[in-house]
């Protein structure tokens, strides 16, 4: 007798600034899980988390997937339950493996991973530790530094430092002395370039700190380097493997949210035109970065490469990378010989190891 399909609980949406990206990623993942031979092996059970953190069952999730954007509140069943997670909207024995397609806080940061761990059910991606450290840029950078991995200079701070004029002035002076301009101001716990700004002088730095503080209480300011932006994808658990290296090129001043998710605003070069030795170095750094934060399953590692000096700087790791039409993670594996349906199947099988 043929075996029963593996039931995949695809969770998407989420109470984060990357809600819209998550919906787009989920559409890609679900289509891949239902393509070709996967249709016989997997049964998709979609669950939607709205922007207030409420979990909704399949019929609501399917409506969101069909219209490719969040439902208006008056389209949701009333009376609305309280915001936040209360319970699963389905029996958890309906799911064999969870596939979180969540970006940003409350999904990529170890919170949902902790829930699945408590439930005793397998899930795609890193565990609680790797997800949490990989989400918080300050914790991530500390782990990279402890592993001896190269990074651009940076300064970390708490929003409380900005609420006292004297402390803020000292902090700004330190940033200018240690990093100079240009520099990039980032919330520690956001992705997809949400809340990030480039500062070329003090007024822009102050404005950037204020904007980043809208998204997080922990911030990081990084020295801006003139370098190529390269990415490498990682797959596996017991034995991690790295994809070919890809490059993002764009006309904009930097790789912001609009450039990242608007068709035609950026171009990808896969594989990136690099000497073999440089590609091998970047692949090695990608694997070392995963080990440093205890990431596994899937990850995308971003680096800067200065052609003139030959320097490679580790930028960040993303433990739940996007799966949109502009997302590098699936494209990097496609160029490495792993088609999207095979990729999602491997991710599910890895989760069950």
Curated annotation (Swiss-Prot):
UniProt gene name: ddl
Query: In what pathway does it function?
Result: Cell wall biogenesis; peptidoglycan biosynthesis
Which parts of the sequence bind ATP? Answer: 176-231
What is the catalytic activity of this protein?
2 D-alanine + ATP = D-alanyl-D-alanine + ADP + phosphate + H(+)
This chain belongs to the protein called: D-alanine--D-alanine ligase
Q: Does the keyword Manganese feature in the UniProt annotation?
A: yes
Which EC class is the enzyme in? ligase
Alphabetical list of HAMAP family matching this protein? Dala_Dala_lig (MF_00047)
**BP terms from Gene Ontology:** cell wall organization; peptidoglycan biosynthetic process; regulation of cell shape
Q: What is its EC number?
A: 6.3.2.4
Q: Which cofactor does it need?
A: Mg(2+); Mn(2+)
């Amino acid at each position: 007798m043929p075996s029963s399909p593996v039931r995949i609980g695809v969770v998407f949406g989420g109470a984060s600034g990357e809600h819209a990206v998550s919906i787009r990623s989920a559409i890609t993942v679900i289509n891949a899980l239902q393509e070709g031979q996967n249709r016989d092996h997997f049964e998709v059970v979609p669950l939607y988390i709205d922007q207030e953190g409420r979990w909704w069952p399949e019929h609501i999730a399917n409506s969101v997937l069909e219209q490719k954007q969040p439902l208006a509140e008056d389209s949701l069943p009333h009376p609305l339950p309280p915001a936040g997670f209360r319970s699963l909207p389905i029996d958890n024995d309906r799911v064999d493996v969870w596939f979180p397609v969540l970006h940003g806080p409350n999904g990529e940061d170890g919170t949902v991973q902790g829930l699945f761990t408590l439930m005793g059910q397998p899930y795609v991606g890193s565990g609680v530790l790797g997800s949490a450290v990989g989400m918080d840029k300050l914790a991530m950078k500390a782990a990279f530094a402890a592993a001896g991995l190269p990074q651009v200079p940076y300064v970390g701070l708490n929003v409380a430092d900005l609420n006292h004029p004297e402390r803020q002035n000292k902090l700004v002076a330190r940033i200018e002395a240690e990093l100079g301009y240009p520099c990039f101001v980032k919330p520690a716990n956001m992705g997809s370039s949400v809340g990030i700004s480039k500062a070329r002088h003090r007024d822009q730095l102050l404005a950037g700190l204020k904007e980043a503080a809208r998204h997080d209480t922990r911030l990081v300011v990084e020295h801006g380097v003139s370098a190529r932006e390269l990415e490498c994808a990682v797959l596996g658990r017991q034995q991690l493997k790295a994809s070919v290296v890809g490059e993002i090129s764009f006309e904009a001043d930097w790789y912001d949210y609009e450039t990242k998710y608007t068709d035609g605003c950026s171009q990808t070069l896969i594989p990136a035109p690099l000497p073999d030795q440089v590609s091998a170095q970047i692949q090695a750094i990608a694997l070392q970065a995963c080990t440093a934060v205890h990431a596994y399953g899937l990850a995308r590692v971003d680096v800067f490469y200065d052609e003139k000096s030959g320097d490679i700087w580790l930028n960040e790791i993303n433990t739940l990378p996007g799966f949109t039409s502009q997302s590098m993670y699936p494209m990097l594996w496609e160029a490495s010989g792993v088609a999207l349906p095979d990729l999602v199947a491997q991710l599910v099988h890895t989760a069950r190891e």
